[in-house]
Amino acid sequence: MGRTQPSYTMAVNRELEKLERIIERLHSPILSLLLERVKEKVRYTQSASYDELVDPYNLVYFALIWALAEECEKMEEYVLDAYPIKGGVKLFLSNFKEKTIRTTFPVYTITDNPDIVLQHPEVRYYEKEKWKTLDGKEVKVYRFEVESLDAYYYMRKRLNVVNETPTVLSQTLYRLGIKPFRRFRSSDDEFPKVTIARVVPLDWYGESLKGKVFEVKINNEVRRFYEKPEVEVDIAECLGEACNYVKSNVKIRIEKKRSPVSAKGLIEWSFISLTPIHEIAYATIGKVLTINEAWVAFKRRIIIPKVVPRVEKLRRLEDIMMVDKGGLILFPQPGCYDNVYQVDFSSMYPSLIVKHNISAETVEACDDIKTELHSICLKEKGIIPEALQWLIERKSELKKIDEERAEAIKWILVASFGYLGYRNSLFGKIEAYEMVTYLARKTLRRTMEIAEEMGLRVLHGIIDSLVVKGDNVDKFIEKVEKETGLRLDYKRYNWIIFTITRNNTPYPTRYIANMNGEMIAKGLIRENMPNIVKSFLEDVLREFSSAKTCSDVKKLRIRDLFEHYRKRAINGEPIDYVIWIKDVPYVRGIKGFYEARLGYMGRDVNYYINYLKRVYEDVEEVMSRC
């Protein structure tokens, strides 16, 4: 071919330099990353082509096409998780693929001497920016770009570092356009098509850290393995030794979780909070809520401090008694009622926060809305209302397609009200909390008045829900929605039973209802009951499901069912005697309670028979009121 190896290499390098100049003019981080891939391909192709040298121009652009094809393939994968490394982030993608992105990390600091920070070897440069505090005061903030999180940890010990929520890693991914559980560099809003598994060992008492049997649920298919399973999925939640038999880019240990949501729920949290899943897998609900609120502040360039010092102002005792009342509860008249409706405000507390613009920085800031309690400012939308509004809308949409993900959003919305009054909340304030309970009581009282005005009988009311009896419920709901500006849902029950305590007082949080054969039982079956008692009550509810009216309930006979379970208490399986208390299994033995994990060592038959008898008598008492 008339070319020597050195001259050929020089020709290839010239073509690479041309391509590099073109990419530099475009100022694209993605193309710059692509150029590095092209150089790798060129080196590989050169090393394999010494015997038959390819034209330098063709070689470079062949490498470009090759790199583009690989990048496009990776863009089809979902970003499952991300970890910081020196000089960049490492992405873990679906189908066990990985990708490294070269970048720096932003660290926001309030300092009078930014130049001295540059002496740290991993601090590249800084930019001066204008931010403001929650009360609107403008502050000078320096954004340092660092090569690794080690530099960030060094700085936060010595400087006033702010904007640490969302995390530095989350901020880095956000500005790179990389969002968890989306396709690489994509903003699509569809739930990722990934494989999700739950793998747990089973012992005689149920789920265990160790066991000879393994229950494996992959997406919606459940199987049991009587030997060590081999599981390969994108995301797995696993318990104890089961984690040793799972291959996954995201592995969540169930025993470390601090939230009530499943792996699918954690994916939803990661998805909405733009936070890598490993940062929230073991977090509380409050942390996820705070991250979502912090993103609103961050995008508005409002400084997010480590701690917000808030001191409650001095008040008279009578003032505190007036505001500190909590939610409104109407005690029901015990008994059974046919043809009733349960009317619920959908996400009542979060909806009131959004409607009335309740946030730490809006309460007592100006007098746009005056109440007997506090005033609210409407000049700018509050951080908390903005953070909650789209979550309310998302929950409503998800309920139509995926109850599990909707439940994950529901937990955040439930926590949103309590965190308003939490002393360590970044965006909370006790006065804001008081405003919400005040408006909730006012709203429920007015709803009860409307019901009575329209001839409905109010049987029960608790915080955000009413049980009413009568006609024209549709018109009642329409009027309440129009007057309050809040959305209502309702269910029609064939019958409902309100119960009493053993002290003969109404039990507002416990009732049993039949909705066309589907049983709704609140406060009846408790988590800390023995398994045999839970099974008894579940069978009682199955009997109740056949009753179409209160009269039918009264005709039911459950004595035979009780006798069956009394005999089972004497001759039952060991698992019947297990009692779960705070995720620990116990059994009541002759000498007292012992941990089931130590092995089965007998049971106190009288304890279980007496427990069943008490519950049976409670059920009979309930039926006698029909």
Curated annotation (Swiss-Prot):
Belongs to the DNA polymerase type-B family. The keyword DNA-binding applies. It comes from Saccharolobus solfataricus (strain ATCC 35092 / DSM 1617 / JCM 11322 / P2) (Sulfolobus solfataricus). It catalyses: DNA(n) + a 2'-deoxyribonucleoside 5'-triphosphate = DNA(n+1) + diphosphate. PANTHER family: DNA POLYMERASE CATALYTIC SUBUNIT, DNA POLYMERASE DELTA CATALYTIC SUBUNIT. Its EC number is 2.7.7.7. Keywords: DNA replication, DNA-binding, DNA-directed DNA polymerase, Nucleotidyltransferase, Transferase. The keyword rRNA-binding does not apply. This polymerase is devoid of exonuclease activity. GO terms for molecular function: DNA binding; DNA-directed DNA polymerase activity; nucleotide binding. GO terms for biological process: DNA-templated DNA replication. It comes from the Archaea. The gene is dpo2. InterPro entries: DNA-dir_DNA_pol_B, DNA-dir_DNA_pol_B_multi_dom, DNA/RNA_pol_sf, DNA_pol_palm_dom_sf, DNA_pol_type-B. This is DNA polymerase 2.
